[in-house]
């Protein structure tokens, strides 16, 4: 996390809800900077950030259980506006003198809220006597309010569904305004931030860009930085931001493991050298990687081999440069908070980027992570701010291990070339059909299965290619994309006709869950 105060910010205290990140997304969408802190370190985070408002998240815990999480008292002593969501409402009530009981009437899913009284938080949105859809997910419920609170809305199973202490600017809801199933939820959060807390909402990528550049210059000084450039959006945006800050003090290294999409490495190198004047080393290590991967079928073993070889190769190239004091990395905010569990204690380990895990310690370098406060969509917006073309920023996610995990079973050069060609044709057809931006991720998979076919007058015995396409918001859940059959037939025909080694194409109609987006 950052180590500085943020004027006009919101602190989100995380009690372990699976949707706490969505609260942060809604706050950011309202143009306001926010940070998530686990409840164990919330007092420290409050003092550091110096926010103008606090939001208390939901939790899988029960407020009636001994030792269940609590908000630090400093929040209620501060005089700042507080918005408690689900568990956040319950712990606020208990800590301020109200009562909560383990629910006999559990409430999950869609519910309807009846507004009984007007409230400052409803301004321009709801009025007394109206009814609105919300999303509930709770077992416990408030049974007695603290002094100063009143009920402003109810549901059939939650008589204290929306409570308010307008004088102290404390608000609590039993439902989840952060999820899309509460249609007016984002506006409620926006009203709390703008109308109740008085925060302007002028946090922008332009402002973030200047702040990040200033911080990088202050951190790096006149020292050297090296950055692992994968060709993905995250590492590319990080590299451009660092380059804007320190110029020629940055050297980027692209380790080409031979597992990238067709022409990808060459295109990335050309773009950054020609258009952004970056000092970029292109290291062709494909023989080294594929040589060790050939015949390896276990997906976890593949990942470990790729990770180890990447570190070894990167380390060797960095030493040739004479070393550096700093390592640039495209860590995002979800990476920072992903490993923070409300049961995990105050000391947490931040997840390392898959490509450079272990490098800072091995090479005695400090990390420069200019994106660690941003979500993925914000990184894309920053990329546009930095001048990256939409065609690059809008590319589908691509895994660090590359085609190795889209080739189940043993890997060989021949299989990788077959897969690379099939994948290129599939993506070409998607673009021609105008579907690329409607799909979260699409790719081909080469199965370790051969089937009998007939081509011309001859019998064939060749591989099966599976096509995958999903829609998603954040990659946490996904549904398969519903193509029309004409498109699938056209793509399959091209692949079979143009790619030697494939004689059958199938389409994967598995959602996540129960499946994962990638096959390995």
From Swiss-Prot:
Catalytic residues identified in the record: 86 (nucleophile), 176, 178
Keyword Ligase: yes
Top-rank taxon, per record: Bacteria
The enzyme's E.C. designation: 6.3.5.2
Catalytic activity: XMP + L-glutamine + ATP + H2O = GMP + L-glutamate + AMP + diphosphate + 2 H(+)
Keyword ATP-binding: yes
CDD domains in the cross-refs: GATase1_GMP_Synthase (cd01742), GMP_synthase_C (cd01997)
Annotated InterPro entries: Class_I_gatase-like, GATASE, GMP_synth_C, GMP_synth_GATase, GMP_synthase, GMPS_ATP_PPase_dom, NAD/GMP_synthase, Rossmann-like_a/b/a_fold
Domain GMPS ATP-PPase: 203-395
Gene Ontology molecular function, alphabetical: ATP binding; GMP synthase activity
Entry keywords, A to Z: ATP-binding, Glutamine amidotransferase, GMP biosynthesis, Ligase, Nucleotide-binding, Purine biosynthesis
An example Gene Ontology CC term for this record: cytosol
Binding site for ATP: 230-236
Listed pathway(s): Purine metabolism; GMP biosynthesis; GMP from XMP (L-Gln route): step 1/1
Domain Glutamine amidotransferase type-1: 9-202
Assembly, per entry: Homodimer.
PANTHER family, A to Z: GMP SYNTHASE [GLUTAMINE-HYDROLYZING] (PTHR11922:SF2), GMP SYNTHASE-RELATED (PTHR11922)
Primary role: Catalyzes the synthesis of GMP from XMP.
The protein's name: GMP synthase [glutamine-hydrolyzing]
Annotated organism of origin: Rhizobium etli (strain CIAT 652)
